[in-house]
Structure formats: structure tokens, C-alpha cells
Amino acid sequence: RYLPEFREIRSKNIDFIKLCLDENLSSEITLQPLRRFNLDAAIIFSDILMLPYALGQNVEFKKNFGPILGDLDITKLSTFDEIDFVKKIFPVYKAISKVSENELLKNKSTIGFVGAPWTLLVYILNKQSPKKKIKEDFFKDQFLINRILDLLDKFLKIHIKNQIENGANIIQIFDSWAGLLEEKDLPNYVYIPTLSLVDYVKSLNVPVICFPRGISNYKNYCEIVKPDVVSIDYDTDPKKIVKEINHPVQGGLDPKILLTDKENLKKQAVNYLEIFKDHPYIFNLGHGVLPETSPDMMEYLVNTVKDFK
């Protein structure tokens, strides 16, 4: 979102879903950061909401608001099969194939991803971003919730399998709304559904990264879900994480730091690198790059990390 070459493409392609389904443009966007920076991996340009879209739910992205979803007809999904699903988002897999075969990815990783079942359930039923809380009556129809979670488990695994078969050699699971749940609800809605996906990815001999954004107990999460790597957000204390868990860790740096100056950026980045110097660690931000970020600051950050000893 912060690269001028991306903005040029985006300005000519207003429909975000159509852009994700254009294998040539989505693969080009995926490769753009690698042309500028010495990165170790590329994450495919797509969206976690491609899954409800592929299941027949209308998904639109409204400027300065976010996603708006229509109704999901659960009755139709009883006859919906893998062929129907894959056909609807096949260009996503074609884009992954194009990216993974590109010379820029030689000796580097191609990251595919999905939304976690809980986060997708929130979008499917809430029909938009919940911001800081979900509706009071969200859990009223437990039968419907369980049915949707079962469907998500089935089709998320199909989505994961197709990404891997087309060249993704890492899968990341984004649980953007995990932090909305109380601790007592995490087992049913986060731990168990995500563990099912993690076990599936591991069965395909591919490493899996999980990002349970906003949760407070990473220790429990890692012990139960057992991701190969856990991503932390910028509200998480990295010193506490180092003491609590043995799992490899990714991320943490607040994207807003990139909007300050180079001296402060270096100080904050080196702080993370020092904290995790004796712990398996993948340097990354604790959330997405902000659109107003200068590419020069990103280049400075990448070089700072690469030069750290």
C-alpha cells in the first residue's frame, strides 16, 4: 500500500476482489517489494476474505471503511464441493505459481495464507470489521456457528492445499480478531479450530506461522496450537514473550515507528533484535505497513536488520 508502483496499479483497479483474481497483477504486486528491498520472503497479494467470497458470500471493500459482506446462504453450501470452490478463486493459485517460479524468489520463501476460522466466522456473521467488540447476540445461534466452523475447516484445508501445491512453502494463519474473545472462549473458537489447520499444514510438511492478534496468553496458545512460529503484535511485550515461550517468534515492531525518523527507527528495531538475539526470531512488523510510510524508511529498516550483528 505504501509503494508508488502499487498505488499506480490500484488506482486503475478499483474492485479489490477483481484485483486479487487477476493472476498477472496480483503476482506483480507480490513481487514489487522484492524488487526494491533485500527481503527473505514474499507473501502473496490476496486477502483472507477470498474464502467467504469463494463460498458465495458477496464481499466488497469500501474506501475508508473496510470490507462489507452480504449474507452467506448456508443451505447452498451443503451441495458446494471442492471443484466449485477452487474454480472461483483459481487465479489466486495461478498467481502463487507465477511468484514461486520467479527468479526473484530463488532461495527465498513464498508465503501463502488464510484467515483463522474464528476471524472468518466474525466477518461472515458480523458482515464487517467488528472494530473493538462483537455484537451481543453473536453467539445466540450455536448450531449455525458450529456448522459454519465445520465448513470453514473443510474449505480452509482445500485452500491451504492448493496454495502449497502451487508453490507456497510457508503458510501463515491470521487470527485478526482473536483478541475479542474472553479467555474462557478461546479453546472452542481459537485453539481447537486453529490446531486442526496447524496439524493439517504440518501433515503436508510445510511450516506454519500463526498470528493470534490481541491475545494476552501466548504461552497457552503455543502449548495448545503448536505453530512452528508465532507472530506477535506491537502491543505485546517482547521481553515477556522471551521469558514465557520457547517457540520461534515473528514480528512485534509498531508500524508507526516507520513514520518517525531514522534514528528512532534504528533504536526500536535494534531493541527487538537485542531482546531476541538468543531466541529463534524472524524480524517483522507487528501489523501491516501503513500507506503513508516512505519506501526510504523501509529500505533503511531492512538494511538495519541485515547489518545487525
Segments (PLM) and residue ranges:
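Conserved, mostly hydrophobic/aromatic
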Residues: 34, 99, 156, 163, ...
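Glycine-rich, proline-tolerant flexible connector loops at the mouths of alpha/beta enzymes
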Residues: 41-63, 78-85, 168-187, 286, ...
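N-terminal basic, low-complexity leaders that serve as flexible interaction/assembly modules and, when applicable
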Residues: 1-61, 105, 296-309
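Active-site mouth loops of central-metabolism enzymes
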Residues: 12-26, 133-158, 254-264
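Short glycine-enriched loops at secondary-structure junctions
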Residues: 1-2, 47-49, 65, 114-129, ...
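Alpha-helix-loop-beta-strand connector modules within alpha/beta enzyme cores
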Residues: 90-107, 184-206, 243-247, 301-309
